[in-house]
């Protein structure tokens, strides 16, 4: 029977300490509930007393019954030369009313002498007293040995003495922390194995990614005998982040065979990763192992030809086992297999014998040479293929468009100082777009104002189509990227625009290229609307 490994998630505390990461108390509750449903064993909610949000979280968490997870409150050992009952921080941990208390204490003599400035003996007493205090209050106690690996390399006898103090006072588990993230996997493996042989209580691991080996260090510690791994979803955390749970969990379950999270739940890993990113308002890392959009994306023609025959020839696991899916990219590097698999992915019926496949491949290479890129523009690729197969049925015909801008001068007039104007502020920087299209046998003319030329064009085009295709009202432009393709040409440089759109259910990308950024944007907008209408027609 495989060894049981416990997942201790600290996204809500250590993860929230990452730059640009902030959760409301409501966000924390939603994430905690999602982690519990996923099967996480421990959820560290925060540091009681450090901020109002954390106490709000603990108050709300106490009202809920979690299925698989125990909620932990995080805090420090008592202050030097202070009794636990007189330490306000200790009191806040009691008031958090959690079944688990996680105490962090000093292990490295450098920190004892130079940071908290007490004696080695008093530090050991601080650890023992604090653990004992919470055990007497009926708590499960996790002891986090801060900077353990640095402390052990500097003075192994003292580092072990701090662990011994926690164990002898009743700690349920001692967790070895690579707080600075500078220890290598070989060192972690050796030191963890040495600690495991000398401790009677369980041993855990907490790593950081400063050297890029946070996940490797966690796995090395598990193989050396640790039974709990601490980390964060998507690797959020101080500096370069903590051990990434979205990498550790599938490694433990799918590759190493540990009893950890059920395979059924691991198949929802990507959804969990995306959910946490959404609440943190962080753009998803497409290159993240296992759960990133490119984790199972194939571009080279040889690769695609191989996976078409045997998927595992270029995939280390089945994408679906972590809730991901295979993607085939089309580019100037594509071969016939790329085109066929991408067409199949987009619901188009192509075979190796389809004579137009060669034409599609040739046209694709020419367009990419001209600056087009279809990796993030599947919808434009779909329309391109339909046109080359002579199956494209346009839903409308663009005729003309105009964009006008009216603004006030707010600069300096030579010899006259700062300029001024009596015009109303509502007229400043006014952008209007006029669109003429042919739709349903009619010529339609619309004019709309917007926050910029692309926004104005988008609004005008949709206004022109709305009476004919009401579903257009649901379409929103959610991302807009511009890239200058030839910076040496200055203002005459060709521009590539990639637009991402959604109707609330599906999301799709389109591309446009032109020396005129507005024309490039218009091309991408037209493709976006065409694709939406095509998909709606197909569903009927």
What residues fall within each predicted segment?
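Mixed-charge, glycine-accented linear interaction segment located at domain edges/termini
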Residues: 506-540
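A mid-to-C-terminal "edge-of-domain" accessory segment
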Residues: 4-5, 11, 250, 256-440, ...
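Flexible glycine/proline-rich, aromatic-decorated loop/lid segments
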Residues: 213-229, 236-251, 294-318, 494-498
């Amino acid at each position: 029977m495989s060894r049981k490994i416990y997942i201790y998630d600290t996204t809500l505390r250590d993860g929230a300490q990452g730059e640009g990461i902030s959760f409301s108390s409501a966000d924390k509750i939603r994430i905690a509930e999602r982690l519990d449903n996923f099967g996480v064993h421990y959820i560290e909610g925060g540091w009681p007393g450090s901020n109002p949000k954390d106490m709000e979280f603990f108050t709300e968490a106490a009202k809920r019954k979690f299925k698989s997870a125990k909620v932990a409150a995080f805090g420090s050992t008592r202050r030097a030369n202070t009794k636990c009952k007189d330490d306000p921080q200790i009191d806040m941990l009691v008031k958090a009313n959690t079944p688990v208390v996680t105490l962090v204490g000093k292990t490295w003599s450098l920190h004892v002498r130079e940071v908290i400035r007490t004696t080695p003996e008093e530090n050991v007493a601080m650890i023992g007293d604090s653990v004992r205090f919470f055990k007497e209050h009926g708590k499960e106690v996790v002891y986090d040995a801060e900077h353990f690996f640095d402390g052990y390399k500097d003075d192994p006898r003292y580092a072990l003495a701090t662990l011994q103090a926690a164990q002898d006072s009743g700690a349920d588990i001692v967790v070895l922390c690579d707080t600075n993230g500078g220890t290598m996997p070989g060192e972690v493996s050796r030191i963890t194995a040495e600690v495991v042989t000398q401790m009677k209580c369980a041993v855990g691991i907490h790593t950081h990614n400063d050297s890029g080996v946070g996940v490797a260090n966690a796995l090395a510690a598990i193989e050396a005998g640790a039974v709990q791994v601490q980390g964060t979803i998507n690797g959020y955390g101080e500096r370069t982040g903590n051990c990434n749970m979205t990498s550790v969990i599938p490694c433990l379950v799918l590759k190493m065979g540990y009893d950890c999270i059920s395979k059924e739940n691991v198949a929802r890993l990507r959804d969990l990763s995306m959910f946490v990113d959404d609440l943190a308002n962080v753009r998803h890392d497409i290159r993240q192992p296992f759960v990133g959009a490119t984790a199972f994306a194939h571009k080279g023609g040889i690769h695609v030809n191989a996976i078409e025959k045997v998927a595992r020839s270029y995939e280390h696991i089945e994408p679906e086992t972590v809730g991901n899916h295979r993607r085939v990219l089309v580019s100037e590097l594509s071969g016939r297999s790329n085109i066929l698999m991408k067409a199949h992915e987009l619901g188009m019926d192509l075979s190796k014998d389809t004579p137009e496949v060669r034409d599609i491949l040739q046209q694709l290479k020419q367009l990419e040479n001209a600056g087009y890129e279809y990796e993030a523009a599947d919808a434009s690729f779909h329309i391109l293929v339909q046109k080359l197969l002579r199956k494209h049925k346009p839903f409308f015909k663009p005729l003309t468009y105009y964009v006008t801008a009216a603004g006030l001068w707010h600069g300096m007039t030579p010899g006259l100082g700062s300029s001024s104007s009596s015009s109303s502020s509502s007229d400043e920087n006014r952008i209007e777009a006029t669109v003429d299209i042919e739709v349903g046998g009619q010529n339609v003319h619309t004019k709309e104002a917007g926050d910029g030329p692309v926004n104005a064009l988008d609004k005008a085009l949709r206004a022109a189509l709305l009476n004919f295709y009401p579903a257009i009202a649901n379409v929103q432009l959610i991302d807009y990227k511009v890239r200058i393709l030839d910076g040496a040409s200055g203002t005459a440089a060709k521009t590539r625009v990639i637009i991402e759109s959604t109707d609330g259910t599906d999301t799709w990308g389109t591309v446009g290229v032109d020396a005129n950024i507005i024309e490039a944007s218009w091309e991408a907008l037209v493709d976006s609307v065409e694709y939406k209408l095509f998909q709606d027609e197909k569903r009927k």
